[in-house]
Regions:
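Outer membrane beta-barrel
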Residues: 1-105, 109-144
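Surface-exposed beta-loop-beta
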Residues: 113-196
């Protein structure tokens, strides 16, 4: 199997829960593991899930337009991380902000953690049956791991990508930025849809 998934979802009144495990490359990894509390147009999510940064990263695997997210997206965004996020949504607006560690449940590190503060805003000035204008802006401020003093990768950000296929998961592109104090990234989204 390239990627075998098994998971469970549960809901009770205003609460939701999701746990999903993945098996790929002879390794088992926890994918999603979170609880959500929703009230009216707001929700709070805590656990391990995608940071609200790139639309290509946070959409479901079933909704991907190609076999894999673009290589640039894989290199410049993070996978799932442990954290907490607040979301507010209406028909025309979506706002999400969160605080995340640099750990995921499948790769717990014995180190001083970096952290990230994320935010995403979406505005849909036109949102009808056959017409849509979607404008989005997202930002992340991240600090690197304060790893143990004897580690060579202290205060380093790594950008890497396996390319456009998960069949061969070897890293094709990698760049390390060392002696980093923090990083700040901005992402934009624009979608215009019109159907006669």
């Amino acid at each position: 199997f390239n990627d075998l998934r098994i998971g469970v979802k549960a809901t009770y009144q205003n609460w939701g829960m999701k746990l999903e495990m993945g098996y790929a490359g002879n390794k088992v990894a926890i994918k999603d593991a979170f609880a959500t509390y929703s009230y009216k147009n707001s929700s709070i999510q805590i656990g391990q899930f995608y940071e609200p940064f790139s639309l290509d990263m946070i959409c479901s695997t079933f909704d991907l337009r190609f076999n894999q997210s673009p290589g640039a997206v894989l290199a410049l965004t993070n996978s799932r991380r442990m954290g907490v996020a607040y979301s507010y949504r209406t028909q025309y607006y979506y706002l999400c902000g969160g605080f995340f560690t640099d750990n995921d449940l499948s790769n717990l590190k014995n180190a001083s953690q970096g952290y990230a503060i994320d935010g995403r805003l979406v505005y849909r000035p036109l949102y009808e049956q056959a017409k849509l204008v979607h404008i989005g802006l997202a930002a992340i401020h991240r600090t690197p791991d304060g790893t143990l003093p004897e580690d060579e990768n202290r205060n380093t950000f790594t950008y890497k990508s396996p390319g456009v296929s998960t069949i061969d998961n070897r890293t094709l592109i990698q760049a390390d930025v060392d002696h980093a104090a923090s990083q700040f990234k901005i992402g934009t989204e624009l979608l215009i849809y019109y159907h006669k």
